A protein has these predicted regions:
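Glycine/proline-enriched, intrinsically flexible loops and inter-domain linkers
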Residues: 5, 54, 62, 190, ...
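Conserved mixed alpha/beta core segments that line enzyme active sites in large multi-domain catalysts
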Residues: 48-76, 150, 244, 255, ...
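Mobile "lid/hinge" segments at catalytic clefts and subdomain interfaces of large enzymes
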Residues: 110-142, 155-159, 163, 311-411, ...
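A carboxyl-terminal module marker
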Residues: 2, 23, 439-443, 447, ...
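Extended, well-folded interaction surfaces typified by the phenylalanyl-tRNA synthetase beta subunit core
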Residues: 181, 414-582, 746, 775-785, ...
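Phosphate-backbone binding interfaces of nucleic-acid-interacting proteins
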Residues: 1-206, 341, 358, 364, ...
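Beta-rich nucleic-acid/ligand-interaction surfaces
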Residues: 40-43, 201-204, 455, 495-500, ...
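Short, hydrophobic beta-strand segments
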Residues: 2-7, 161-170, 223-231, 364-371, ...
Length: 796
């Protein structure tokens, strides 16, 4: 926020150096990021050209006599063709320093002594923003209608003799997005009285309701809408003092009516807009949501497609502005405007923020609305605009204001505990001292039984009533009292030994285990595209289609919150394969989100992908290596009773997939990619995937360590082959082996081979059957097993 020094002096008695002011403001929480001095030229003054004649020795040079307010006129030799007798121009005299550091000395030019040099905008270091015409590559003609005193410093003539403080603001202080708000804080920092502005009422004649009508269809997004009407407009440039202040604040002057709205924006921090009432059908302002497919052409000439969640200012038939962002081109103030309606409204901050983001268009108005404006300020702003209309004689003011108010504008009173504030700040201030400090920034407070009863001014929207009140007031008291005045003390309080939660411990263990098995961790975006679910062959009625749509996505390809990690894993694989990295092992622990009627549900998932190989078939990734990886992870986590059974998602190969369960609860699925999925994602080879519900996995994790003595007697390994029906799963046979009732202990049963006969009778295997080979271990805690014990157990 730019604060011109001269504007500051309208409200505050300024009695310090600029650096001291910056230091004092910093201690109050406002950093002065830059101090911009006045125009950096010296000994450049205004002159009037009294006579011009051709140079006697040069065809392209002219000799000018100039009046600088001294007794004798000076002579300037120039090649400028745009100067003429009677015009006023800047002239650099003997010893002048220009913006680029050039020093000017009297010089003979083809036999005629020139006492200086006429200056253009480039020599003065200014452009068209500071003064119209300064951007031209010629001498600057001072033709703004003002008769300047000859010899006047050019800084004063152009109004660029002001110092600008560029002040950084924090988001919690929207009241300081105004000159008045900053000056209020500056007065307190300097220990001076703040000269509160008083708006002079302009009664006018008639009633605004006779000229216009306002209807607010969505009071939640527009709690207050104030309007006043001015007729018999005289559209002309605003006075120089107003133009200078706008320019110094970075705003281009347009005409008196538009400049008034911008001036009030800077002064009070409340955005306004002026409509040409003749362009509003039936003179009826309607504040409504946009309709699907509606387009509004804004003042910058761009057509902007608006959506139903955006708020528009409209008439009964068309939009005439995007609320809080920018007015419409079809109702702008022009030289032919005779009647205007001044709008001063309050719009919902969150809605304006979303609209700004969707339209990718931010303005000075939207910047203030997104931080929040105050309902009381709407009336003050429109009345200040009317006062300026009266001061400038810009038109005939119509009497009463139109006010559609659904906002709470009642006075807010809060109570704060003096003792608690002192404990927070480690101070010993009395309630009276605190009240005096608060009064310096226009916050009235009374002391009653060690309590502060505070009437919160309308512009301090950051002070809330509730459990945070003491902290809000302590913040104000602390910065006003001065943090450098608070005695430093050592921190004290109860300390507790920190510890990681069970979930974090398990997550770290999973990450360590996966890394030990050669996996690298991924962090993919939580966003995905609607098309990805089609690429993964996910059925329309599948839970994974129950997605959360983003209101303001980066693009359509990132418009949904993901419900599975699989898409991101496959995209990572594709990227790596395209970069000639044909082998990889990756895992990701991330959140997925499902759309529920009340609130979206967030789940943490573990995703695993392995693909490619070293060229050796035995070392290539396959279904069984992935199964072994998952089993090893379960072993590290102390999980028993895990089962792998037929089933799994549609994105997995029908013959190479399984659901994973623990103690009967399904926690995930694993398998090889479906050939169609490989084609959809453009994969060069198959991938082996697993997705496991991390929270369910953690629930079955056993952190306790059980002591198991080493076997006293030898373990005997055995292999068997059995012929079973083709639809019999290996897990079914493993369960039979592990639960066989024998006199010895049978454990660690695993399948290591499956053979399907090529034809009936092949290797003695009947039609419809298959051969499966299993390994297992036999042992006894009491004795060494004999061949008879072993054979009896195997035959069982």
């Amino acid at each position: 926020m730019k604060l011109p020094l001269k504007w500051l002096k309208d409200y505050v008695d300024y009695n310090v150096t600029h650096k001291e002011f910056a230091s004092k403001m910093l201690l109050r929480g406002f950093e002065v990021a830059d101090i911009i001095p006045e125009m950096k030229v010296s000994n450049v003054v205004v002159c009037t050209i009294t006579h011009i004649e051709q140079h006697p020795n040069a065809e392209r040079l002219r000799v000018c006599n100039i009046d600088i307010g001294a007794e004798n006129e000076l002579v300037i030799v120039t090649n400028a063709t745009n100067v003429y007798e009677g015009c006023q121009v800047p002239v650099a005299l003997d010893g002048a320093i220009l913006a680029d550091g050039t020093e000017i000395k009297p010089t003979k030019m083809r036999g005629v002594l020139s006492s200086g040099m006429f200056c253009g905008g480039a020599e003065l270091g200014i452009n068209d923003v500071e003064y119209e015409g300064a951007g031209a590559d010629s001498v600057l003609i001072l033709n703004d209608g003002t008769k300047y005193t000859n010899g006047m410093r050019i800084q004063e003539a152009l109004g660029l003799d002001d110092v600008i403080f560029d002040i950084e603001l924090t988001p919690n202080r929207p009241d300081c997005q105004s000159i008045i708000g900053l000056c209020r804080e500056a007065a307190s920092a300097l220990g001076q009285k703040f000269h509160e502005p008083v708006i002079k009422p302009v009664a006018g004649s008639g009633s605004a309701a006779d000229y216009a009508k306002v209807t607010v269809l969505n009071p939640n997004l527009c709690p207050r809408y104030c309007a006043r009407v001015v007729t018999d407009l005289k559209i002309e440039p605003s006075p120089k003092w107003m133009q200078l202040r706008l320019k110094l604040s970075g705003i281009r002057p347009i005409n008196n009516i538009v400049d008034i709205t911008n001036y009030v924006l800077l002064e009070y921090g409340h955005p306004m807009h002026a409509f040409d009432l003749a362009c509003i059908e039936d003179a009826h302002i309607v504040v409504r949501n946009a309709v699907e497919g509606e387009v509004v052409t804004t003042l910058d000439g761009k057509q902007r497609a608006v959506t139903p969640d955006m708020l528009l200012i409209a008439d009964p038939h068309k939009g005439v502005g995007i609320a809080g962002i920018m007015g419409g081109l079809n109702s702008e103030i022009t030289g032919n405007t005779k009647v205007t309606l001044f709008e001063s409204a309050v719009f919902n901050a969150a809605n304006i923020r979303r609209t700004t983001q969707k339209l990718h268009h931010s303005t000075d108005s939207s910047a203030r609305f997104t931080k929040g404006v105050e309902a009381v300020n709407a009336e003050l702003a429109v009345n200040r605009a009317i006062e300026l209309v009266d001061i400038l004689g810009a038109g005939r003011v119509i009497g009463s204001m139109i006010d559609v108010c659904n906002a709470d504008i009642s006075e807010k009173v809060v109570n704060a505990d003096v003792c608690h504030i002192n404990r927070i700040l480690n101070t010993k201030l009395s309630g009276e001292s605190m009240a005096e400090l608060l009064s310096s920034i226009s916050i009235p407070a009374e002391v009653c039984e060690n309590k502060l009863r505070i009437k919160v001014p309308h512009f301090r929207t950051d002070i809330e009533d509730g459990i945070e009140t003491d902290w809000d007031i302590a913040e104000e008291v602390g910065r006003l009292y001065g943090y450098d005045n608070i005695e430093p003390t050592l921190m004290h309080g109860d300390s507790f030994q920190g510890r990681l939660s069970r979930s974090v411990i398990i997550e770290d263990r999973v990450k360590d285990t996966m890394a030990a098995m050669g996996f690298m961790e991924l962090y993919n975006y939580n966003f995905t595209s609607p098309q990805e679910y089609d690429l993964l062959l996910i059925p329309e009625n599948d839970e994974k289609r129950n997605t959360v749509r983003l209101q303001n996505p980066f693009g359509e390809d990132q418009s949904l919150m993901r419900t599975t990690l699989i898409g991101g894993l496959l995209r990572t694989m594709r990227t790596n394969c395209n970069k000639k990295s044909g082998h990889g092992r990756f895992f990701e622990i991330g959140n997925v989100h499902f759309n529920n009627p009340d609130l979206p549900e967030e789940r943490k998932m573990l995703g695993i992908i392995a693909y490619g190989g070293t060229g050796n078939v035995r070392n290539a990734e396959n279904f069984f290596t992935l199964k072994g990886i998952i089993e090893k992870l379960f072993e590290i986590l102390g999980i028993e009773n895990a089962r792998f059974e037929r089933g799994g998602g549609a994105y997995l190969h029908p013959g190479q997939k399984a659901v994973v369960s623990i103690d009967g609860e399904v926690i995930g699925e694993m398998g090889c990619t479906h050939p169609r999925v490989e084609k959809n994602f453009g994969l060069s080879c198959s991938a082996y995937l697993a997705e496991i519900d991390f929270n369910k996995l953690a629930a079955h994790t056993n952190n306790s360590r059980k002591y198991r003595p080493l076997p006293k007697f030898p373990i005997v390994p055995r292999d068997i082959a059995v012929v079973v029906d083709r639809n019999i799963e290996a897990q079914t046979v493993i369960d039979i082996i592990n639960t066989a009732k024998t006199q010895v202990i049978v454990e660690n049963a695993k399948v290591f081979d499956v053979y399907y006969p090529k034809e009936a009778g092949d290797k003695g295997i009947p039609e419809g059957k298959k051969s499966m080979a299993f390994s297992f271990e036999l042992r006894s805690d009491e004795r060494t097993l004999t061949d008879e014990d072993i054979n009896r157990s195997v035959n069982t």
